[in-house]
Amino acid sequence: MTRKSIQEREKKRIKLAKTFLKKRKELKKIISDPNIGNDIRWNAVLKLQSLPRDSSLSRQRNRCSQTSRPHAFLRKFGLSRIKLREAAMRGEIPGLRKSSW
């Protein structure tokens, strides 16, 4: 299990990202538009840099919903490979079977 502080930090990042998502998108749209003047684009870059670092989506880490394990995470199930295997062996995931060839 991951430490509680790391789990809380991740929750905080998710909350911050939701809060600033719209503003971040608007600023990135201004920055990427070549028809806007350089001074306006530069101001947009400065505003984007002034936003909290943790409000960026790339700062988030996908974690297992049961153990908060960051590695070997499968997006489709929201679990790490270890917990996915355990759940599959117990038959808790519909349509998932152990392969055999």
UniProtKB/Swiss-Prot annotation:
Swiss-Prot/TrEMBL keywords? Ribonucleoprotein, Ribosomal protein, RNA-binding, rRNA-binding
InterPro entries, alphabetized: Ribosomal_uS14, Ribosomal_uS14_bac/plastid, Ribosomal_uS14_CS
Q: Which domain of life is it from?
A: Bacteria
Q: Name one GO molecular function term.
A: structural constituent of ribosome
Keyword match Ribosomal protein: yes
Gene Ontology CC annotations of this record: cytoplasm; small ribosomal subunit
RNA-binding: present as a keyword of the record? yes
Q: Which Pfam families match?
A: Ribosomal_S14
Q: Which GO terms describe its biological process?
A: translation
What does the function comment of this entry state? Binds 16S rRNA, required for the assembly of 30S particles and may also be responsible for determining the conformation of the 16S rRNA at the A site.
Provide the family line.
Belongs to the universal ribosomal protein uS14 family.
On subunit structure and binding partners, the annotation says: Part of the 30S ribosomal subunit. Contacts proteins S3 and S10.
Q: What is this protein called?
A: Small ribosomal subunit protein uS14
Q: Which gene encodes it?
A: rpsN
